[in-house]
């Protein structure tokens, strides 16, 4: 009751402070749409590809690490579910932080998250060509089709990778500009296809348990690797917990997509359950994917190949190799590729909503709050395309290996979620909500740890193995923070000269 009264007070009066009295966005996002949006955000399919398994250590158990990462994500899911049901507004956690904690902090952190996300989307788009090359190369070798192998080798070159990435993202942006609902439909189609391909791949691996080791050994050799023998313990708590941050940073905590579009979600049931359903489905997919690899190959063989052939031997390559028909090979290969573009499709929507929310609060130019009759924030999408194109150009300029350092900016993502936890703590103290307080304390504590790990573990790119901060990553992270602060201060003083106080805006919940 207290929060309803609190929100009622905030919503009274000064609606003129915002760009307009209604967002103009349309409530057209179904339960299925928002669940698929969240699953794309959590990227279960890529957790089964090469984002995690190459970092396995002797004694690591990915099943236990996945379970722990899932359990530790539950408090964060509670915090997000609490706020999405109480304050269902475009921009999600940005709105919560800026209203419950501090407007300036909320705006600055949202800007840093969006810039970090742009770099991540550009890297995902650029390196999607590696997934395509791997699929074409493997299917080509399985069927003696050297044309496919040659095409794959061409696509992996910098300029073709840039063209492919930019063209794919431009198509996704174009669909979203044409009609907002089409953007969500694209998410749902890619999501359902990706999930179906993953389930089929699980079935194929289970159907080949009897000769899995022999067949995948042949695959490793054919793909240029050397089959490794395992020497190490069958289990180590230290090695298992070492894998926890990889799952925590690349998969489970990314649950802000649904909340970011919460003003467009139809029905209270979808608002209340979308985060939990997405989290549970992601957990099941990741656990099943790792589980069938252990089941079919055994712990020793699978761990040895993850350590020594991690970019050849994984869930997807094994499933393609074991498929007994080209149709299945292509289905699974396209499923992997779909996961890559699934991320880009969700990113196009989520980025636009954060920028829209910032513009609605007058932090960014009002043009970014313009919505077409079809419900599309057109200019935020155009900004997204241009900015992603810029980062793609940076990747080509730096070289793909140097550009990998941009992944180190994930420290900004973990820092952002830490601030969400702090906002939850502050609000729970004011409203005397014990359950929210406990969940927020656990969330803040967890992301304090993850922020430290992302800044100190060389595997995450911010810190190098010699103990020196990567200069590319440091420049990007510091530059992002400085730029975000500068944008907020410029907006604050610009609006103040025009008689609008941003502090007053942040005392109100924005209209739907």
For each predicted feature, which ranges?
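TM-loop-TM module centered on a large, flexible mid-protein loop between adjacent transmembrane helices
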Residues: 95-98, 102, 276-345, 364-410
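Membrane-interface loop-to-helix entry segments
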Residues: 162-219, 274-281, 410-419, 431-445, ...
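Hydrophobic, small-residue-rich membrane helices and short re-entrant helix-turn-helix hairpins
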Residues: 21-27, 92, 178-189, 253-289, ...
């Amino acid at each position: 009751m207290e929060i309803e009264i609190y929100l009622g007070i905030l919503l009274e009066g000064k609606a003129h402070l915002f760009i307009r009295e209604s967002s103009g966005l349309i409530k057209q996002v179904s339960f299925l749409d928002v669940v698929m949006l969240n699953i794309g955000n959590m990227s279960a399919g890529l957790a089964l590809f090469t984002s995690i398994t190459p970092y396995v250590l002797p004694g690591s158990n990915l099943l236990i690490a996945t379970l722990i990462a899932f359990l530790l994500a539950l408090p964060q899911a509670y915090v997000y579910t609490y706020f999405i049901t109480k304050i269902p507004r475009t921009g999600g956690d940005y709105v919560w932080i800026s209203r419950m904690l501090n407007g300036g902090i909320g705006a600055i952190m949202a800007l840093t998250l969006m810039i970090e996300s742009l770099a991540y989307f550009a890297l995902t788009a650029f390196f999607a060509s590696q997934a395509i090359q791997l699929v074409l190369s493997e299917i080509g070798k399985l069927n003696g089709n050297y044309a496919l192998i040659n095409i794959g080798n061409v696509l992996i070159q910098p300029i073709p990778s840039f063209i492919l990435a930019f063209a794919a993202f431009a198509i996704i942006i174009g669909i979203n500009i044409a009609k907002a609902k089409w953007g969500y439909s694209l998410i749902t189609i890619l999501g359902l296809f990706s999930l179906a391909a993953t389930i089929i791949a699980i079935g194929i691996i289970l159907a080949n348990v009897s000769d899995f080791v022999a067949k995948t050994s042949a695959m490793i050799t054919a793909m240029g690797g050397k089959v490794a023998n395992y020497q190490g313990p069958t289990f180590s708590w230290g090695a298992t917990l070492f894998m926890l941050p990889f799952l925590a940073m690349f998969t489970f905590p990314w649950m802000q997509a649904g909340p970011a579009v919460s003003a467009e979600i139809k029905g209270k049931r979808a608002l209340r359950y979308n985060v939990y359903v997405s989290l549970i489905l992601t957990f099941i997919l990741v656990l099943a994917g790792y589980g069938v690899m252990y089941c079919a190959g055994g712990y020793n063989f699978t761990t040895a190949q993850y350590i020594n052939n991690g970019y050849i031997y994984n869930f997807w390559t094994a499933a393609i190799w074991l498929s007994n028909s080209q149709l299945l090979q292509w289905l699974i290969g396209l499923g992997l590729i779909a996961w890559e573009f699934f991320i880009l499709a969700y990113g196009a929507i989520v980025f636009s909503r954060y920028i829209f929310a910032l513009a609605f609060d007058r932090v960014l130019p009002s043009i970014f709050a313009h919505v077409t009759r079809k419900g599309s924030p057109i200019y935020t999408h155009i900004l997204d395309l241009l900015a992603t194109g810029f980062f793609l150009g940076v990747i080509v300029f730096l070289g793909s290996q140097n550009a990998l350092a941009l992944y180190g900016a994930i420290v900004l993502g973990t820092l952002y979620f830490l601030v969400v936890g702090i906002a939850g703590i502050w609000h729970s103290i004011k409203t005397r909500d014990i359950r929210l307080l406990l969940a927020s304390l656990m969330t803040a504590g967890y992301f304090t740890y993850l922020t430290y790990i992302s800044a100190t573990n060389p595997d995450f790119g911010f810190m190098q193995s010699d103990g020196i901060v990567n200069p590319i990553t440091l420049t990007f992270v510091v530059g992002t923070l400085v730029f975000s602060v500068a944008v907020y201060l410029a907006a604050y003083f610009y609006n103040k000269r025009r008689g609008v106080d941003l502090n007053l805006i942040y005392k109100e919940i924005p209209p739907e």
